[in-house]
């Protein structure tokens, strides 16, 4: 049951409140909590110089205190409330001590879900989260609802909660970090798929899966859980559903949910045809799955006509198999979002011919064997870069040896060199794609910056 936001207003007033992290989502939160009368101290690992005067001056009129620099968490003592940044583990020494002192530990997203008056659609998974979230958002908007999007994408929503009405709809993309500590779940929960990911942060795969499960473990009767029938991990969640259960599948007929019929190419929802695969503007079977998940999610709120209109007109999300340009008969695609092997495999499967693949980046301690075993025959030339380039090469070398095949592998020092190598080996009709199978943090702040740099390099090729 939704809680009255006035409860929070009364609760937070005059409370000594720590906000850990001064990133994009927490800055509006600091302003918001300050206006509600909280006594704010902002914490960040960056120094005052690294944050810049613009950020510090942003809070000059609100009496916000700062604890900055390498040992910033040593001052996390004596607070009534602590808003943690999503990537901060709840079992970190500083948070454990704060909790022992009696502090209420929470996050911007947890409080939003708790007090949001509108119906919330939550989406999580290893791959396909952003596209599925955006599809649900577009379908609800097409139907005429005032719709908000947040979480990993869009804007921080807790600071806008007073503007959200009971008639609105809210769509949230939720990461394992955001879900790890929440004790509330959205009314509609979608789990697109699950595979090894973020094992540099999570202790093991079990912890990662359990974090994802939080999207539905606090649901109640009348709520909806939507899972991928074709993914072993998500399909095993069936017995844990607390409300209604819907499934989607590209491999078999599903009565209670959505499925793809290979014979006629149609997508069905509750055994009624919605559209044909070829009606969908963005190509690839991974996008068919994203659409099926979205159809299930909005099935009680959106007409078939609105679903079809979005399918025919939605052009995709930036950095997701985004066409950049064609030069000398070679097409270049930006798939920088592909920060896991499974995501890269999905990308490779979307092309009709083997591609020149640029991969590699930050090491999340996940295995690359699936990429090598399932992707080798879809790659014409493999160009590797970043911290994982040797690790990926070793994995592919084993498969090349076992299968007695030829697959040229080129090692590059950086993205610019990788693109230049791709241009050298590409011939008329080839496809070059940046689909790293890794996070970007060894060279770039995030996948968007990496993708934009790739586009800049490609657009400057002559």
From Swiss-Prot:
Signal peptide: none annotated. GO terms for biological process: cell division; cell wall organization; peptidoglycan biosynthetic process; regulation of cell shape. Keywords: ATP-binding, Cell cycle, Cell division, Cell shape, Cell wall biogenesis/degradation, Cytoplasm, Ligase, Nucleotide-binding, Peptidoglycan synthesis. InterPro entries: Mur-like_cat_sf, Mur_ligase_C, Mur_ligase_C_dom_sf, Mur_ligase_cen, MurD. Transmembrane segments: none annotated. Pathway: Cell wall biogenesis; peptidoglycan biosynthesis. Its EC number is 6.3.2.9. It catalyses: UDP-N-acetyl-alpha-D-muramoyl-L-alanine + D-glutamate + ATP = UDP-N-acetyl-alpha-D-muramoyl-L-alanyl-D-glutamate + ADP + phosphate + H(+). HAMAP family: MurD. Cell wall formation. Catalyzes the addition of glutamate to the nucleotide precursor UDP-N-acetylmuramoyl-L-alanine (UMA). PANTHER family: UDP-N-ACETYLMURAMOYLALANINE--D-GLUTAMATE LIGASE. This is UDP-N-acetylmuramoylalanine--D-glutamate ligase. It comes from Clostridium acetobutylicum (strain ATCC 824 / DSM 792 / JCM 1419 / IAM 19013 / LMG 5710 / NBRC 13948 / NRRL B-527 / VKM B-1787 / 2291 / W).
């Amino acid at each position: 049951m939704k809680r009255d936001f006035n409860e929070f207003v009364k609760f937070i007033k005059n409370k000594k409140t720590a906000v850990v992290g001064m990133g994009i989502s927490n800055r509006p939160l600091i302003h918001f909590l300050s206006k509600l009368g909280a006594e704010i101290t902002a914490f960040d690992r960056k120094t005052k110089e690294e944050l810049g005067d613009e950020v510090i001056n942003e809070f000059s009129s609100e009496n916000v205190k700062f604890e900055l620099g390498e040992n910033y968490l040593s001052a996390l003592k004596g607070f009534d409330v602590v808003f943690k940044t999503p990537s901060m583990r709840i079992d970190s020494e500083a948070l454990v001590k704060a909790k022992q002192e009696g502090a209420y530990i929470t996050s911007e997203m947890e409080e939003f879900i708790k007090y949001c008056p509108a119906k919330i659609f939550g989406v999580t998974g290893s791959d396909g989260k952003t596209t599925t979230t955006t599809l649900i958002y577009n379908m609800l908007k097409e139907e005429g609802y005032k719709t908000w999007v947040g979480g990993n994408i869009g804007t921080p929503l807790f600071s806008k909660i007073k503007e959200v009405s009971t008639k609105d709809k809210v769509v949230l993309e939720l990461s394992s970090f955001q879900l790890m500590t929440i004790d509330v779940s959205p009314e509609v929960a979608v789990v697109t798929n699950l595979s090894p990911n973020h094992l540099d942060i999570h202790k093991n795969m079990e912890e990662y899966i359990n974090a994802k499960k939080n999207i539905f473990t606090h649901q109640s009767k009348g709520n909806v859980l939507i899972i991928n029938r074709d993914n072993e991990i998500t399909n095993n969640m069936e017995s844990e559903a607390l409300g209604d259960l819907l499934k989607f599948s590209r491999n078999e007929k599903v009565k209670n949910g959505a499925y793809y019929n290979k014979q006629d190419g149609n997508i069905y929802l509750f055994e009624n045809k919605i559209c044909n695969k070829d009606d969908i503007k963005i190509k690839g079977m991974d996008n068919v799955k994203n659409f099926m998940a979205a159809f299930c999610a909005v099935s009680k709120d959106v007409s078939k006509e609105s679903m079809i209109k979005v399918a025919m007109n939605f052009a995709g999300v930036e950095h997701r198999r985004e066409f950049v340009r064609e030069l000398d008969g070679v097409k270049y695609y930006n798939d920088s979002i592909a920060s896991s092997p499974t995501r890269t495999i999905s990308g490779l499967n979307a092309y009709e011919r083997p591609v020149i693949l640029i991969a590699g980046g930050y090491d999340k301690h996940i295995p690359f064997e699936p990429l090598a075993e399932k992707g080798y025959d879809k790659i014409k030339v493999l160009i590797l870069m970043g911290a994982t380039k040797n690790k990926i090469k070793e994995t592919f070398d084993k498969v090349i040896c076992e299968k007695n095949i030829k697959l040229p592998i080129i090692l590059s020092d950086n993205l610019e060199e990788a693109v230049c190598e791709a241009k050298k080996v590409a011939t008329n009709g080839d496809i070059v794609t940046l689909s790293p199978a890794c996070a970007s943090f060894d060279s770039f702040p995030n996948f968007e910056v990496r993708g934009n740099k790739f586009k800049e390099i490609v657009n400057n090729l002559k």
